[in-house]
């Protein structure tokens, strides 16, 4: 199956801050991941094995928006124990060519 989509540049749309957030949880991680995925600023959620139970990618307007998202939405979710935020400084490579090899 092939799907053709347009990929926008968040910077060009006024979203100057992107970050990856590692989330540690207690309880049903699938339910927490679904709640994280429902947040408007979240564009990627994956359940993982290792240091984090979930990894979340967010796109925010600025650092204040990121801080608000962390404090009032992500960390406020029942079952979220802690987070670790990795702020993107520069996107070096991003490609969408799965299945073209």
Residue ranges: model-predicted function:
Residues 1-101:
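A compositional/biophysical signature of low hydrophobicity enriched in polar/charged and small residues
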